[in-house]
Amino acid sequence: MTSGNLNPKPELAISVVLFHSDLDQFDRLLASLSDALLPTQLAVVPVICVDNSLNPDYALRGRAICDRWRGVGGLAIDWVSNAVNAGYGAGHNIALSRLNSRYHLLLNPDVELDKSAISEALRLMDSDPRVALLAPVGFDSHGEPEYLAKDYPSVWVLALRAFAPRWFKRLNTKRLDRYEMRRRADANNVRGIVLASGCCMWVRRGALDQVGGFDESYFLYFEDYDLSMKLAQQGNLLESQAVRIVHHGGDAARKGWQHIGWFMAGAIRFFRRWGWRWFG
């Protein structure tokens, strides 16, 4: 997946995919991006916001927010409204086809970046060319840790997380903790991970092009896990304690039956491609 852009390649480009997302939260994301770009001294950072909502009124409001932030902190923002919603990964692929940079930041609209997140991420990736993907550590809206990086899942663990009552989850704490990779980082505050959350991924663009971007056969869930598995064939996947975000989303099981259906379809596709694990 390469871009036809003939302009000089920027250091960083960013894509955000929205689907009826909270626009107040989207506004806060752009504010955090502007703040996080200040320490980098990057003059221009292209940002493409891809709207899968298929709603003209929503698009008008989203464009107005982009207009307000365009040029602030180097943000060169474009809003793209899709005629068809082909899914989260497909939305990012549209942005990737229009952008070309050394590093690419893939984002959900429901995150906020720490002021040092971008500068720390670029510093780490500059220092180690073997890194294909860098993931942040996450916190929820109340400041509690969110374990965004994951180990390879089993069907049992996914079912526990989605449907089990709390008392039954407590009986399976070790399995759940292992899946959520709740061990500490090493002395350098980084650790290798297996799977990264698509809510926030720094990727080396050359590695991303090698694997062809997102697999668009996933609609909403597990496309990030599939991409992680592919990128692991190109280099290392790391999580850095110095790169921090707040994540306001997640929990597909609480979003209704449609999301549960998308989640199950994505899980089946992922296991068929990368191998079934029933327990563990």
Language model feature labels by segment:
Residues 185-188, 192-212, 217-244:
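A short, conserved alpha-helix in the catalytic core of glycosyltransferases
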